[in-house]
């Protein structure tokens, strides 16, 4: 079953500010996530039904929440990992 992709409006702005190579990498990963969103290795503690996509080379992270009832993957936050900022932002947006 394929999930639908939605962005929090603030996360969409963060995503649009990124460079094209980083966006393309996230798009590839998001396409995989929409097929299989529950990846145990990427699950985040302390954030209900939230997972991460990380781009190790560039240091960027994307945090998404899986809403099974609506069959939706909701992107909460996109940014650098520095000082766990992307995770703190996602927690505030829940």
Regions found by a protein language model. Give the residues of each.
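Secondary-structure boundary motif
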Residues: 17-20, 35
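A short, surface-exposed loop/turn module that caps and links secondary-structure elements
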Residues: 31-55
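Compact soluble domain cores
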Residues: 22, 26-33
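Enriched for short, Lys/Arg-rich terminal
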Residues: 2-4, 10-13, 17, 24, ...
